[in-house]
Structure formats: C-alpha cells, structure tokens
Design a protein with these regions (language model features):
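N-terminal signal peptide c-region/cleavage motif recognized by signal peptidases
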Residues: 11-14
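Noncatalytic scaffold domains of N-terminal-nucleophile
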Residues: 17-46, 50, 56-219, 224-226, ...
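Short, well-structured alpha-helical segments that form the helix of a local strand-helix-strand
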Residues: 59-66, 149-160, 232-234, 298-315, ...
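Active-site rim segments in enzyme catalytic domains, especially the processed small/beta chain
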Residues: 71-95, 243-245, 378-444, 468, ...
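Short, small/polar residue-rich loop motifs at catalytic or cofactor-binding pockets
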Residues: 256, 364-367, 429-431
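Glycine-rich phosphate/pyrophosphate-binding beta-alpha loops
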Residues: 270-278, 367-371, 383-394, 448-455
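Internal maturation/activation junctions in enzymes
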Residues: 290-385, 398-399, 406, 513-519
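Extended C-terminal subregions enriched in glycine
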Residues: 376, 425, 458, 467-527
Length: 563
C-alpha cells in the first residue's frame, strides 16, 4: 500500500505484511490503534510498548525504550552517552531535547590532540560528560505522563533477568572483542573466564547495571549527576587519566531547542537543529523538490545518482554551517536549495571542488535510533550514541555501563575552530531524528544510525514513501545507495536481484570511484553499514498506527495493544 503522493487514492490497508530485502531479510510491518514502538531490539521495543499499555504516552514509551536499549544494545547506547529527542505533541507543538555529551572543564586540548594524532580514540581520556540521561529525564518530567521510576523499571528487569543478544549484536561483540579485552569491567560483562563471548550462554545478565538502574528508579536522574553515582563516575574517570569531575556532572543540563521545519511535496518536515544533521536532510529534500517527482519514481540509476548528488551538496553545506553558525539558516532556505540544485548535472558526478566541502560535523558509529507514535497522535524520534562501538571501551566496575568516547571527535589544533574542546562545548553529531507530518499528523517518524551515511539513509526512505508511494515496510526494506564521507568519500550500494551489476556499473560510469558494493546474503556486521531506519507513522488512508523495524540491525516493532 502506498503512502506518498500516490497514496491519496489507494486500496484499503493490507493485513500485516513482510517486505523482502532479497533474498533473506524482511521488514515486518506492525499495525495498531494503540501506538507502536520501533527499536533495534525486541526487548527495547517491548519495554516502550509496556509503557503505552500502562497509559503512558509516546514520550514515556520512548524513554523506556531508550533506557532498555542501554541494556539490550550496549554497544551503541546507554547511560554513558548522548540522546537527541525530537518530540511532536498532538496539540501541534514540536520540541527538540538535546542531551549531547559535553566537554569537561579540565579537558586538555594538547592531550586530546596527541591521542588523536596517535590514532587513539578510546580510553578514559576520550570520555565527555554524558548528557543522555539528562535529556530522557527532562522529557519525562515535562512531556511524559508516568513516574520516572515506572519508565526505568523495564530496563532494570532486563539487566537483572538477562537478555539474548540477536545475531547482529553477537557479530558486533565478535568484531570488537579486542576493545572489550582492553577493559576488565567490559570483559567481565561480555566474556567468560576463557575470554569467549558470554552471550553463548542462555542469558546475558548485567547485575552491576541493574543496581545502577534500580538506584536511578528510586532516587531519580539527579543521583546520576549530583549523587553517589556521580561521585563514583568522577573518581574512576579521573583516576584513570580522564577529565570528567563531579562539577562537570553537576553542571550538566538538557537543552530545549527549536526544531527545524521544511516542506517537501506538500508534507511538513520537522528535524533536529544544527549541529545535528537534520538540516542536511531538509536541504537534500528541498533540492530534490526542484526536480519533478517522476525523476525519483523508480529506483533506477538516474534517481539514485540524483539523490546522492543532493545529499553530497547538503552534507557539504552542513559541514560549512557547523563551522560558521551564521550560515545555518541557509540550510532550510528553499531559495538556497534552488540555487544549489542548479549545480546538479545529469551526465556526471560533481567534483569535490564544485561542491566546496569543509571539515565539520562528527561522524558517529556506535549509535541507534527508535521511533514512537501513540494513540493520541504524539510522536517521538529519538537517536542516541556512545560514539564508537562500546564507546570509550571502559566502564566503572560498580556501575556496569560503557562511557562515551565523544572527546575523540574534537579537534585540539585550532583554538578558534568550532570543534576545539572548549569547556561545555557540545558534540556536533551526524544524527538526524525526523518527523514527517501530513495535515499535522505524524505520517513518518524516522532516524537512523550509520555515521556520515545517516543523511542518505533518512533522505532515501522519505523519498521511497513520498515519491515512490511505498508502504513503510517496502520503503525500509528497499536496497539503499548511500554517500559516505568517513575515510575517503565514496558511494555505497546494496545490490540484489536482476540488474545489480548494471546498477553498480552505472554509478561508476557516472563518476563515483570505488563504489562499495554489498551483495546478498551479507554478514550481519556488513549489513549494518547501511543504517537502521526504524520507522513509525500513521497510515494516511486507514488511520492505523504502523511500525517497521529495519532488518539491517534486527529492528523490532511492538504494539501498544493490550495483551
């Protein structure tokens, strides 16, 4: 069933369906009248759905799911990281809650630069002040309906009773085993006495994390920033060469900032503001909006290259705007997008010097995304990160969660630069939580992990829904073509089925060198390269609330319907 431009006059909704990502993966579509929660693990999605069934709203459910991800997807999120929360309230109010990690007051630019030069991006010296829990607690207090203790309870139970990691989680553990071995605490959590992956056991229990979460449920998030937990964190971090002190934790506050707004083919786009990457998605869509929908109607080489060129331009403008904040307003200006659209050629890729990219926003790998829509029409698009897989690769034994490695993203060379580690400076992420509204209702709630590829992933799923009229399941499962700027800039494509070789050849002829090609069936660790766009939304035809988990990272959609 189509949702986009073609979806205004379509047949009635199909029952629950599975769209295939050939030849082995499927994106399962869940429909509900009571709300949906979509996250990278079943446990997290069910934790959020539990809050919906208890009478909570989308904010409560998103908070519960985010905390549960810290237990069930510890390589990508947790109490030691950052959270970015885009909220749409049914009464028509949009809010962005920024829980970015911050530079501690004692951070030494010379030390950080020496580590960066040496290629060291983990360890206690890379730990910034965690802001994620502050954002979650702020959102629950101001926009939720359930007590904070109730929101934390599912995560406590998961840590206490244990989880079974999915295949992609096991693949990440195996791939980053050496990072775990660098920390006795993380080794003890995830590896057994023979240094073999502990998830081979029936359940992975995390008793230290369970104790920490239980304290937070009883005393609230203030304990994390101003109580015994804060003191324990600061003592361990500073004793091991890090810079986070109790004063830094005490000063941490979540920030509310105005979201950005754009418009694409008659749909309203709500996005996270700079320094995040939501503005780049809006600009890419505004650029694509200068071309007729027919140019994007089919997933042929021409539509793929058009989308990639729009994303390349938008990423370059984002990086420039992050370095020069007065330019940020241009990113959502349709006149600017119209001018930039004239650069795009139909016969070849733009050269880098034609786009004029600049160094800029941080590319984050250890990240995740969840989406929620409740029965009242409230929606949350939430992204979170600990920066690298397992963050800094260190954890305090008594607390049981890995710290972020966000200080490794700052640049200590230029004191006047936007990425200089000044005290209090916030991380500039590539995360892009988004909400697409139709007549004020959340038609699509979306975001993704995936470092610099996030803008491509999110833009492409929106195009799939709006321009190609795909259902959410088909839009998420459709093979992707993305642009990556981590390392040498390059295109990457998922290929499957008839014509795959011709598609790759067409991209190379267009001027994209060294196209990274992922053929099916892939390894789970390779499939993750193309993001994890867990989506939710209201079907404009039936009014059903729909959730679709991205199969690339074992995404799961859970319903708020009574059990």
């Amino acid at each position: 069933m189509a949702w986009g431009l073609a979806g205004l006059a379509l047949a009635a909704a199909a029952p629950t369906v599975t769209a295939q990502l050939p030849p082995a993966l499927g994106a399962v579509e869940v429909r509900s009248s009571a709300g949906v929660v979509v996250a990278n693990t079943r446990e997290a999605a069910e934790a959020g759905a539990m809050l919906l069934r208890a009478g909570g709203n989308a904010v409560d459910a998103a908070a519960a799911a985010a905390l549960a991800l810290g237990v069930s997807e510890p390589e990508a999120s947790g109490l030691g990281g950052s959270v970015w929360m885009l909220i749409h309230l049914a009464r028509g109010v949009d809010i962005f809650v920024d829980g970015s990690a911050a530079v501690p007051a004692a951070a030494d630019p010379d030390v950080l630069e020496a580590l960066r030069t040496a290629g060291v991006n983990v360890g206690y010296a890379s730990v910034a002040v965690p802001g994620g829990l502050a954002a979650i607690a702020h959102a629950v207090e101001h926009y939720g309906t359930r007590p904070f203790a109730e929101v934390v309870a599912p995560a406590v139970a998961l840590a206490e009773n244990g989880i079974i990691l999915p295949p992609h989680g096991l693949a990440v553990l195996e791939n980053f085993r050496s990072r775990l071995l660098g920390s006795p605490t993380l080794t003890g959590i995830f590896l057994d006495e023979s240094l073999v992956l502990r998830p081979a056991d029936p359940l992975l229990c995390q008793p230290a994390l369970a104790r920490t979460l239980r304290v937070l449920a009883r005393l609230g998030a203030a304990e994390f920033y101003r109580g015994e937990i804060a003191a324990t964190m600061a003592a361990d971090i500073t004793a091991n060469g890090g810079f986070v002190h109790t004063a830094d934790l005490e000063a941490m506050r979540a920030l509310e900032r105005a979201p950005l707004h754009g418009r694409y083919r008659g749909f309203d786009i709500v996005a996270s503001p700079p320094p995040g990457a939501g503005a780049a998605v809006i600009e890419a869509l505004h650029i694509l909006g200068r071309f007729p929908p027919e140019r994007l109607a089919a997933a042929d080489p021409g539509s793929r290259t058009l989308t990639l060129e729009a994303v390349r331009i938008a990423l370059a403008d984002l990086l420039l705007a992050v370095a020069h904040p007065p330019l940020q307003a241009l990113l959502v200006d349709k006149g600017h997008a119209a001018r930039r659209a004239t650069l795009i050629r139909g016969d070849r890729a733009l050269r880098a010097d034609e786009i004029v990219p600049r160094p800029g926003a941080a590319a984050m790998r250890g990240s995740t995304h969840l989406s929620v829509v409740d029965a009242a029409g409230n929606a949350v698009s939430l992204s979170q990160s600990i920066n690298h897989e397992f963050g800094a690769g260190v954890a305090t034994p008594e607390l049981g969660f890995p710290y972020n490695s966000s200080l490794s993203l700052f640049d200590g060379r230029d004191p006047s630069g936007p990425f200089y580690p000044r005290p209090g400076n916030l991380l500039s992420p590539t995360m892009a939580p988004m909400i697409v509204l139709r007549h004020g209702r959340p038609m699509l709630v979306i975001g993704s992990p995936g470092s610099s590829r996030i803008v491509s992933v999110v833009t492409q799923v929106i195009v799939n829904v709006v321009d190609r009229g795909m259902s959410l399941a088909d839009a998420v499962a459709a093979p992707r073509t993305v642009w990556a700027v981590d390392g040498s800039p390059h295109a990457a494509i998922e290929v499957a089925g008839v014509g795959a070789d011709e598609t790759v050849a067409a991209l190379e002829r267009f001027g994209y060198p060294s196209v990274y090609t992922l053929c099916f069936p892939p390894r789970p660790i390779d499939l993750m390269y193309f993001g994890g766009a867990n989506c939710a939304g209201v079907d404009p035809r039936t009014g059903d609330i729909v959730g679709v988990g991205d199969p690339r990272r074992a995404g799961w959609a859970a319903s708020g319907d009574p059990r």
